[in-house]
Amino acid sequence: MRLNIAIDGPAGAGKSTIAKLVAKKFRLMYINTGAMYRAVTLMAMRQNIRANDVKKLCDLIESLSMHFENDKLIVNGEDVSEEILLPKTSQNVSDYASVLEVREKLVYLQKKMAGRYDVVMDGRDIGTVVLNDAPFKFYLTATPEERAKRRYKELSAKNIKVCYDDILNDIIRRDYIDSNREVNPLTKAYDAVEIDSSNMCIEEVVDYIVQYISKKI
């Protein structure tokens, strides 16, 4: 049995941190699909390509070489792991990620990666689209306020100046866009295990997932 693990959920739910730790526990490759959409957003903004300029966006993606290296995302030889987390990228990523052609191209790349290795993959549409046949699917959620608090702490720890209210408003806005877009909206897979981590620490969520999987394999 392929040990592919899909972890979905809204912005700031802790998907990346938890997925990374789960991957380490089972010695699997970790693929952060959200980082890939953020990278496209970053590169598009650098070149002043708008989200509605589909042809230029597609050409841009074709020119990008993306791979993960020790939890870092390398794009055309550049480590963009820190820059893609900046507020400017966060505020625009939903607009670019909602473009059909962008999602088609990145989903193709993500499926290709998962076809080569057993993976832990996190995002918005992993359990429903990218790894819809994954044997293990989880949907992480938490209140918008708790998610904003976590993101604020994460960015502040990296000495990035941010405002809690701005983060909260951005999370609420992204929740709406991600859940209502026409292409692969954020939805919980029917066979996914839902985990509300509002009152759970990271270790508790990781332990729950690891124990759940360990009992099945």
UniProtKB/Swiss-Prot annotation:
EC numbers: 2.7.4.25
Known catalytic reactions: CMP + ATP = CDP + ADP; dCMP + ATP = dCDP + ADP
CDD domains: CMPK
Residues that bind ATP: G9, P10, A11, G12, A13, G14, K15, S16, T17
Source domain of life: Bacteria
Compartments in which it is found: Cytoplasm
A Gene Ontology molecular function term of the record: dCMP kinase activity
GO BP terms in the entry: nucleobase-containing small molecule interconversion; pyrimidine nucleotide metabolic process
SUPFAM superfamilies for this protein: P-loop containing nucleoside triphosphate hydrolases
Alphabetical keyword list: ATP-binding, Cytoplasm, Kinase, Nucleotide-binding, Transferase
Gene3D superfamilies linked to this entry: P-loop containing nucleotide triphosphate hydrolases
Protein name: Cytidylate kinase
Main location class: cytoplasm
Top EC group: transferase
Listed GO CC annotations: cytosol
Family the entry assigns: Belongs to the cytidylate kinase family. Type 1 subfamily.
Species per Swiss-Prot/TrEMBL record: Clostridium acetobutylicum (strain ATCC 824 / DSM 792 / JCM 1419 / IAM 19013 / LMG 5710 / NBRC 13948 / NRRL B-527 / VKM B-1787 / 2291 / W)
